Amino acid sequence: MAGNESPRGTHSARVDPLTGERTTIVSRRQSRPNLPDGDCPFCPGGLEAPEPYEVRWFANRWPPLPGGRAEVVLYTDRHDATFASLGVGGARRVVDLWAERSEVLGARPDVDYVLVFENRGPAVGATIAHPHGQIYAYDHVPARAATEYDRFSEHGEDPLDAHAPGPDLERLV
């Protein structure tokens, strides 16, 4: 496939003329399927998980970024689980897979920034309820990430540490 074409539509990079921030428009992204729980492709026997598993990843079938730079990470084969319910061992398996895939994607010459995040609920655009996250490998450093990096560099340490309660401070909620 040539250029930014994918089986799910054309990817178009745009720049906001007011802020200079880059974004990607995917023409057919809104045509992703909304599946009922009974037909979950992430459950064992489903399209993306033919066998039981503990944790797994695969290329996103509806990629928001072109060139194999979007992956889905399934946290568990249990449809009703959450990341918090995985326990230490399950969470460790997920984090290890995040690290492994981030390293692989980050080593690509066309990748400048790797973002790992969790998808949960329709409010954030998740079309499947099964516990999962995604990994995006950008060909540029997004503006917010660049700003955060600059702030870390200015402080020489985590700038949030100055706002965290110390061991002798009372935490107010």
Which residues are covered by each model-predicted region?
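Active-site microenvironments that recognize anionic phosphate/pyrophosphate groups
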Residues: 1-130, 136-173
